[in-house]
Amino acid sequence: MPINSERLAHTFEALVQCDSVSRSEGRFAGQLQARLEALGVATLFDRSAPRTGSDTGNLVGRRAGTIDKAPLLFSAHMDTVQPGVGIRPVFEDGIFRSAGDT
């Protein structure tokens, strides 16, 4: 299946622009959850938020596979470091970069 570069770039821009500074990544987590569920992935949040001081727990997604295929695990951070609010991505010469003010 070919990659839809335009859709991928649009998705990347939308996610980068969602503020997600450490312990305040709940809005980003909600966006990610909606995107995963739209792809048929069952999601849940664990109860780690009170222990970490975050406004959200870890997002866990699971999609049933088949016996004849190897399982796949994907793990990533949802938070960014300061300054991570108001990030404006710029796409130039086939490369994304920050506008330089964050």
Language-model features: locations:
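N-terminal capping segment at the start of a domain
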Residues: 1-26
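Short, functionally important structural connectors and interaction interfaces within domains
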Residues: 7-13, 51, 70-73, 81
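Active-site metal-coordination/substrate-binding segment of hydrolases
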Residues: 35, 55, 62, 68-102
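A non-catalytic alpha/beta surface segment that caps or lines the substrate-entry region
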Residues: 20-68
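Intrinsically disordered, low-complexity regions enriched in small/polar residues
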Residues: 14, 30, 46-47, 93, ...
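Intrinsically disordered, low-complexity segments enriched in polar/charged residues with Gly/Pro
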Residues: 1-2, 46-48, 74-76
